[in-house]
């Protein structure tokens, strides 16, 4: 609304001797009660709170806001960027960025089920770029549950010639080395690896010594939880990151790659904010 339209609207309301609350005076007429103006009447809103209405003829125009200076605009932008850096999403992005600076590996397993006898039957390990570092199938000592088979499509027949855990554990440990490992739902996959080792009477103490980060907790913090468990699925996180699957979903390597993609997508938010902050700081100086 331009100044002429606003003046016409004010004049019409004054001529009609209309009354308004402070909120409507401000929003519709850019006016406020004059010093000493008394309310015409008091009302209650739906919450039981009282509010006053004033005769518009007893009101005065509000002072026009001055345009912000370039310094004020930059200061506002700087505060906005700082707010985003300190938000949950900003902190999760910084965390992901810090993880990637450690040259982590990304691990995923496919399993025989979900319970405390479940074992891994496929392990995939990639780097942050999605390159395969280690990949194997395993012959478990327990049967594959029907629900698990329906998810990953791996049959017991397909594992007839697969190695045992004891055949590949040393190779897996060597492939990981001392690098941190990022896993989507780390608690689950680490439990499965320990159960698999225990089924073969392998103490696998090195599993306890690994530095492990959970990408599911990271993604839930960044994108928000999406289920009744207070977490987020890899598929949902990938969708929100705008990623598409490389290979079949629910294969260990494909899921490890997708986990890497999600972490990279989250991490990318941090340098973009830092670049904005640096630009503002330079121009403020």
Model-derived regions, located:
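N-terminal accessory regions of nucleic-acid-interacting proteins
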Residues: 19, 23, 62-102
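Intrinsically disordered, low-complexity regulatory regions of eukaryotic transcription factors
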Residues: 1-12, 53-57
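Short linear loop/turn motifs
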Residues: 35-50, 163-166, 248-258
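Metal-dependent nucleic-acid phosphoesterase active-site entry motif
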Residues: 109
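Metal-dependent phosphoesterase signature
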Residues: 150-168
């Amino acid at each position: 609304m331009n100044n002429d339209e606003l003046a016409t609207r004010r004049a019409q309301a004054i001529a009609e001797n209309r009354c308004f609350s402070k909120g409507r005076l401000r929003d519709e007429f850019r006016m406020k009660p004059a010093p000493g103006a008394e309310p015409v009447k008091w009302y209650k809103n739906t919450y039981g709170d009282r509010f006053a209405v004033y005769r518009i003829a007893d009101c005065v125009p509000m002072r026009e806001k001055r345009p912000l200076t370039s310094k004020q605009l930059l200061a506002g932008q700087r505060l906005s960027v700082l707010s985003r850096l300190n938000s949950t999403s900003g902190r999760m992005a910084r965390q992901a960025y810090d993880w990637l600076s450690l040259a982590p590996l990304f691990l995923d397993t496919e399993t025989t089920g979900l319970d405390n006898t479940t074992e891994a039957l496929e392990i995939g390990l990639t780097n942050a770029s999605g390159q395969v570092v280690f990949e194997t199938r395993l012959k478990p000592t327990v049967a594959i549950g029907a629900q698990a088979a329906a998810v990953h499509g791996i049959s017991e027949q397909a594992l007839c010639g697969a190695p045992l855990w004891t055949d590949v554990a040393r190779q897996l440990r060597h492939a990981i080395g001392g690098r941190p490992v990022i896993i989507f739902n780390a608690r689950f996959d680490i439990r499965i690896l320990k159960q698999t080792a225990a089924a073969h009477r392998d103490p696998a103490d090195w599993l306890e010594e690994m530095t492990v980060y959970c990408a599911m907790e990271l993604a839930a913090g960044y994108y928000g939880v999406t289920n009744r468990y207070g977490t987020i699925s890899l598929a949902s996180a990938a969708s929100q990151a705008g990623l598409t699957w490389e290979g079949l979903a629910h294969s260990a390597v494909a899921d490890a790659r997708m986990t890497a993609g999600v972490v990279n997508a989250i991490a990318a938010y941090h340098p973009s904010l830092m670049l904005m902050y640096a630009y503002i700081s330079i121009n403020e100086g």
